[in-house]
Amino acid sequence: MAREKEMQEFTRSFFRGRPDLSTLTHSIVRRRYLAHSGRSHLEPEEKQALKRLVEEELLKMQVDEAASREDKLDLTKKGKRPPTPCSDPERKRFRFNSESESGSEASSPDYFGPPAKNGVAAEVSPAKEENPRRASKAVEESSDEERQRDLPAQRGEESSEEEEKGYKGKTRKKPVVKKQAPGKASVSRKQAREESEESEAEPVQRTAKKVEGNKGTKSLKESEQESEEEILAQKKEQREEEVEEEEKEEDEEKGDWKPRTRSNGRRKSAREERSCKQKSQAKRLLGDSDSEEEQKEAASSGDDSGRDREPPVQRKSEDRTQLKGGKRLSGSSEDEEDSGKGEPTAKGSRKMARLGSTSGEESDLEREVSDSEAGGGPQGERKNRSSKKSSRKGRTRSSSSSSDGSPEAKGGKAGSGRRGEDHPAVMRLKRYIRACGAHRNYKKLLGSCCSHKERLSILRAELEALGMKGTPSLGKCRALKEQREEAAEVASLDVANIISGSGRPRRRTAWNPLGEAAPPGELYRRTLDSDEERPRPAPPDWSHMRGIISSDGESN
């Protein structure tokens, strides 16, 4: 309770000093209170309480201003200001004060009224002395803004941010009002002039001045008004950025990011409005006299540019999908996906083009016109070219895919196994085996394989049998080849290895009638020993042939 009382006293004393409401925000009040109380931060409940107290003080200020309006009515009547359709005494009083100060405080407005009115009236006041019609127009605009500003004040259920918009309404409300009719500035100007002429009955001197001003310095005043509106738009943007920063701080506490998106939309509308104004100003400088044409062009420039920008984007997306269709195997379904993707890109390009300058819009329009002029025959040629390209690419793609296709398709064709051996992975493993110093008959080794996966597994097994460990590489293969050559050399030099080893089969004797193969050790010993120790073979037995052949040619 003590802290709440302290906050209440602080807000009362703070608003008694009449602060500048056009730049005042909740975060500024919070910082001032922290500096006043000497604390580093506030709790969320304290922040809400401080917001509520600030809103109460603002409502009290409005009540006090309503009481002081009646006193100021006499002053504005004495100042001989022309009566306006919406004669707000508070606005009249402020205009009187600003003119008495001779426009010196245009940038820092008086603090007797809400900031939405003050910003408009203070910036338009130097032009009012030269052109009373402009003054009446500014007053009408501000009266519309006040009507919109009073709505959130009447609704007590709305959030504190929306009430803050109502009190500091210029930063939020004015872009929305202008968004409703961005290209109808000249129409509102005419209406304002007609109403001001009907209402101005008494001063004859002022009407004469108006006629002179209209005849002599019409173009100069219009250019001045345009420059003033540009300054207003710049100030609006600055204030919008400040309000966005506050919203970010508050949203970080609450976790709600919706207001920021709203303010971004308003900033877009303000930029669109500024681009329309620049167009209309350029046309006036060039000397376009027809005001109706200006209205039509300004009103339809945004919509037409958005509408005309669609066909080139769609055409580009169609060409892209046609080119992609030849490269891919499944054409129609992926074309639909591509066209679906093309729509959001078209929307995004439309948004960027709206935010861009008028030169970008004109270049887009020229491009669209050139595309539409070059339509018909050239477009058909383009489509024919793209279809030819896609058919060519489809042929090459189908041939390569058939080479890498399923094993069933390969089994039905002649020489399909040979094509499988040309697979890059198979060729690489063959090169590794060759680098290891081994030579294999791949026709026998890979003849029974149906797919390149089987070939790869067989070749990897061969590499492992040769002694390859891990992923094969040419460096490992060279090292393995050296090891194998070294082992072969050692084996050839080892005598015991030669005798016992089963190398290439050699023919030791022409024919052994006994059918007994002599052991290899016996053969080696026979060559080393002397002739005496060699066993003699038994003499042949010819007894069974004695009756057939006799030595003397006679038979018994």
From Swiss-Prot:
Positions of the UniProt region annotated as Interaction with the histone H2A-H2B complex: 403-527
Comp. bias intervals (Basic residues): 168-177, 260-269, 385-396
Keywords: Chaperone, Chromatin regulator, Nucleus, Phosphoprotein
Residues the record lists as Phosphoserine modifications: 27, 87, 98, 100, 125, 142-143, 159-160, 196, 199, 223, 227, 289, 291, 330, 332-333, 357, 359, 363, 370, 372, 530, 550-551, 555
Biased composition (Basic and acidic residues): 64-77, 126-158, 209-224, 304-322, 523-536
Residue ranges with Low complexity bias: 99-108
Cellular compartment(s): Nucleus
Covalent S-S links between cysteines: none
Stretches the record annotates as Disordered: 64-426, 502-556
Residues annotated with Phosphothreonine modification: 84, 358, 471
Keyword field contains Chaperone: yes
Gene Ontology MF term list: H2A-H2B histone complex chaperone activity
Modification note: Phosphorylated by CK2.
InterPro entries: HIRIP3, Histone_chaperone_domain_CHZ
Compositional bias segments (type: Acidic residues): 240-254
One GO location term (cellular component): nucleus
GO biological process, one term: chromatin organization
Top-level taxon of origin: Eukaryota
Organ and tissue specificity: Widely expressed. Isoform 1 is predominant in skeletal muscle. Isoform 2 is predominant in liver and heart.
Nucleus is among the record's keywords: yes
Assembly notes: Interacts (via C-terminus) with histone H2A-H2B dimers; the interaction is direct. Interacts with HIRA. Interacts with CK2.
General function of this protein: Histone chaperone that carries a H2A-H2B histone complex and facilitates its deposition onto chromatin.
Protein name: HIRA-interacting protein 3
Native species: Homo sapiens
